[in-house]
Amino acid sequence: FAIFSSLYCVQPMMPILADYFHISPTQSSFPLSFSTIALAVGLIFTGLISDRFGRKPIMVWSLFSVALLLLLSAVLPVWSVFLATRVLIGLTVSGVAAVAMTYIGEEVAAKDVGFAMGLYISGTAIGGMSGRLLAGVLVDFISWQSATLIIGLINLCIATTFYFLLPKSRNFQAYPIKLSRFITAF
């Protein structure tokens, strides 16, 4: 939920961002486009990084980072810096998107993996939809900055809950990060 709500919450804000930052409608699509591109790039690396440092630590780091970056992006008055935070959000979102299914595969009993994967995937869809809806409703009543702060605070609560409730990996085995493993993965 948290990762894709963070990614897509800017979509209903695009016209407001265009007015606030004095940019074109095309440029107002950059926050979502750049964060999605950064997500795609991050997905290549975060799986390998989690092979070294563990699944839960990467996912926890990702969730807290995304929440903090959302909070930061709400107070940035400069377009280029706002865009940079959106790129960082895309990169950090990949820490959950790439690792969660591996965690499920390693830690959930084989008979329950399908159900757990379904819950995760439905959570991502609900997150993407609810991020858009929540932001869209909020910006009808409050500023885009306040809406972003609220979504960031919700994500911070989710990250904290995740940290305390997700069990530590029992079946994880660390592997060193090697360029050869990265190359052979392709």
Regions found by a protein language model. Give the residues of each.
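Juxtamembrane intracellular "pre-TM" segments in multi-pass secondary transporters
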Residues: 167-186
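Cytoplasmic helix-loop-helix junction between adjacent transmembrane helices
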Residues: 85-124
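Small-residue-rich segments within alpha-helical transmembrane domains of MFS-like 12-TM solute carriers
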Residues: 4, 8, 90-98, 129
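Helix-loop-helix hairpin linking two adjacent transmembrane segments in secondary transporters
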Residues: 81, 110, 119-166
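Conserved MFS/SLC helix-loop-helix module at the cytosolic interface between two early adjacent transmembrane helices
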Residues: 41-79
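Residue-level signature of mid-helix packing/kink "hotspots" within the transmembrane helices
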Residues: 8, 36-44, 128-129
